[in-house]
């Protein structure tokens, strides 16, 4: 997850130098740079009551700095406009980065109250910058005369990004339309915050609660103990709780023996945000979609999707839809084949029902066991979380890029589950700090993500301070964290994002931000190393005996990685299409009934959503309603095409080698947004993206017409 306001990258003046603000007391902890190494947030000293005044002071200082840039009587130059804005807003960036971490990963009622209060103020603050006519006039003067400025390629790219950012924010609108835009932006900030908080509460309230552990048969002793611990954490002694994950399907569905309990758990997930209570999100998302369509129209775009994709790698909704259309025939055919096979398996077992979504994972596992002799639970003893992290994720990065890691116990964290590592570059010098927060808790939003406390910048003399968050099952006290291979993949995925941030070799902090249909490229590419023979041999050892994972089990893991791909791809394509259709609404369209719209949108896909529901339902699709992926979820599929092409290149050139890693780092990971995305990709791959390696990686063949 990237920062809300990309301009907030640095501050050249101390707090006491801001005109009219020298008497503010008491001094806020965010007013000065952190005294900790590398600017790490001092979480041991930050109190909840520091955040709101920190935001208020930070916005005031930033506004004063921007006002000086706009009112500068000197002719505009790259330094006194663009560089000055890059240097501005350090206090606001510090408080925003720290608060973003705790509001997402460790929230509480006080933090939720602050979030509600601050969100519209931040929106108004950013509008005041981007809709400032005098400031834009200086940016536009530079843009119009850019050919005469003698800018370096990186400077020219930054100027282009700033000009486009102002235009996309409404700088060319009339005063009346700017007023309308401000109003829409404020409403959206309030609604997006409301959605996020309703979803968190609804997900917690929607957990499966049972009175008898016998109903959880199939989860195993460890799973049942974890359910008891989850109940205890909620004050439900004597009960057992299976918390909901953020996705439609729930991990426990593969294991639960009782079909009625499986259905109950699935329906708890599917209905978590549509119960007609205070946590129902349907009216909220319909209003968000309507406001986005109105905003797009104000800015001269037919739809929100057209607005969003104008600065993405795909360029237009048509291109994104055409790409997904190429996936649907093979996906739909494989979905049907898989469903038929599951029905046959159910019938062969003497049962009379046909497969439903709550049955799919369980019976897919049976088919997998029968066909591949593979049991995912049998692999878990070889995937102990700490070993996966230090001997797998870190080891792969060392082999590819030469980086090394040392745990830091002196850096304060926002929750006891968090660990911190210092990262050293191939020359032994400091590169970054890396925080990891892997276990699920009720105070944490669902899913997994990467974000940063500090972005690297030569201009500001700063190195990366980055964190990964996930929602892996927390073991009972005293038990090892044995995780599934899917969870292993999640750890490699999120660390791919982290590497992208750590390796950014940029002068200007704004160039750290990349498009949604490019940013998932390094993360999904990094997943491949989880099954690399050399990497796997280093981390996959039995947690008790130390024995390496047997070659036969490795072979089964590899075959299993291509199993059930109709479902895996189908749930992604369905939800990406759902996102695109919500954001293909025009400003003239009436406000939608969320349930009816969703049903119609899914029917249009041509996919078997009755058996293979979308990965997220509209009502709990956090990525698009509060996570920055609106009209961008297709990017997960688009970047699978990119990363499979890249991995095919690696395979053809020797695989896991430092030479290959250094080339990927130089041409992709270090570049940020210093070049157009298609230019960067062609420089590495040698040609435009090709969908065939993606389909081959999933074991799918294109369906011939």
What are these regions (language model features)?
Residues 24-50, 217-218, 234, 239-241, ...:
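C-terminal, non-catalytic "cap/extension" segments appended to globular domains
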Residues 5-16, 20:
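Bacterial N-terminal signal peptides
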Residues 158, 197, 202-243, 291, ...:
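Active-site-proximal, well-structured secondary-structure segments within enzyme catalytic domains
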Residues 35-50, 99-118, 141-183, 243-283, ...:
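Short His/Asp/Glu-rich catalytic/ion-coordination signatures at enzyme active sites or charged loops
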Residues 473-492:
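Short pre-active-site segment immediately N-terminal to the catalytic Zn-binding motif
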Residues 68-77, 304, 407-410, 510, ...:
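Surface-exposed patches in mature extracellular/periplasmic domains of secreted proteins
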Residues 12, 23-221, 650, 705:
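N-terminal helix-rich structural modules
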